Regions:
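Class I S-adenosyl-L-methionine-dependent methyltransferase module
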Residues: 63-153, 157-159
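Long, positively charged, glycine-interspersed low-complexity recognition regions
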Residues: 183-245
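Mobile active-site "lid"/loop adjacent to the S-adenosyl-L-methionine
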Residues: 125-128, 173-186
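Acceptor-substrate binding/catalytic loop of class I
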Residues: 16, 149-150, 180-184
Length: 245
């Protein structure tokens, strides 16, 4: 295990950005890497089209191949790029939070402000006063784990066209909470794209359920952190398209 991976094992990252993989990212990484090696994908580019706050990506810090991340949340991508430039964010006050909430301009600061939202759900209400500066300190610890990651300009994952990539997708769960102001995620279209990508790439998908032509290669029960379902068990499955397992 490399130095950066050991660094993260010592780091309990507790920010609850919805859909994050902080708690089980290491297990997912291990399954994907093992299967990639078995399939002859040694050091092939690794791509996450739904990278979020790098809950899974951080575990690839020691990976020798290219690492590429993308997300539809423009503010989060700008935030990650700023962290790569050694940005050290300060404590976020409620006044600053409300200013960014009402702003229509995308920025790293707006992405940072959104992480102070209740239960990590986008600008649902300020929840950063009880531990001032905690979110910023946590992000600073993330910085060395994403050095060298190429974050693509925010945009739709549908435009991706490449071959021989290792791809990990952590899409919004079907039927779960949508962020205010965002277009509802098209799950049916997503699975069609996964079938297409799987023809020329090694593709893994995190979901609780999937179409019948996808099969489970790993599974784990976890507790939901979103307030409306907090404490309820959810089965996290890792799927591949049948014939590629």
């Amino acid at each position: 295990m490399g130095t950066l991976s050991r660094l993260f094992i010592k780091f309990h990252y507790i920010m609850s950005y919805q859909g994050g993989k902080q708690r089980i990212g290491k297990e997912i990484h291990d399954v994907i890497l093992r299967r990639a090696l078995e399939a002859g994908y040694d050091n092939r580019p690794y791509f996450e089209p739904f990278v979020g706050l790098c809950g899974a990506m951080r575990w690839w810090a020691d990976y020798p191949g290219k690492r590429i991340g993308n997300d539809s949340n423009q503010d989060i991508i700008l935030l990650l790029k700023s962290l790569q430039k050694e940005w050290n964010p300060t404590a976020m006050t409620e006044e600053e939070y409300m200013t960014q909430k009402s702003s229509s301009q995308h920025s790293a600061l707006r992405g940072y402000a959104s992480l102070h939202s209740f239960r990590g759900m986008l600008f649902t209400g300020y929840d950063g006063g009880h531990r001032p500066g905690h979110v910023g300190r946590s992000l600073v610890k993330l910085t060395p784990l994403i050095k060298g990651v190429r974050f693509l300009p925010p945009g739709s994952y549908e435009r991706f066209r490449s071959k021989k990539f290792i791809i990990y997708c952590d899409p919004p769960y079907k039927g779960t909470t949508s962020y205010r102001g965002q277009v509802k995620f098209d799950s049916e279209k997503f699975w069609e794209i996964m079938r297409l990508w799987s023809k020329d790439n090694l593709v893994f998908i995190s979901e609780s359920i999937a179409p019948d032509d996808f099969e489970i290669v790993w599974s784990r029960v976890k507790r939901c952190q979103v307030s409306t379902n907090k404490g309820k068990a959810r089965t996290e499955n890792l799927y591949v398209y049948r014939g590629t397992a």
